[in-house]
Amino acid sequence: MNVRYTEKKPPADVEKITCTAQQLSINPGSWITRFWSSCDGALIEDLVKIYSTDEIAERQQTYEIAEYFPGYLLIGDDSGGRLILVDRSAIERFYLLDSGCPSITDGLAFSSMDALIKEVVG
């Protein structure tokens, strides 16, 4: 899928990615660290926001991700009340769920970010 970036920040530097990954216990080879290597946050198709290295820690705290979704990382949202999470395990899975959703199993699961974006954009 070819996506259209409504807003795209320049790549994050290696030091910023490494620091953020260590702070949040993110696997250095994860999807989000690879994304930050190409752009440090973006708005895709006017809807899908992927958080920057400067935003992501605050979002984990605001939505209490460690408490409600241990083992997952909040990486973005759909600009309409749904959150985008990834599994912290080695399996690359993306989840889209309402911000008030009590369980990850109540959300939609995707094997790629492209599939998730396609669902959001319609």
Features from the language model and the residues they span:
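Short, compact, well-ordered microdomains
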Residues: 89-99
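A surface-exposed partner-binding patch
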Residues: 1-85, 90, 121
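Compact, glycine/acidic-enriched structural inserts
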Residues: 100-122
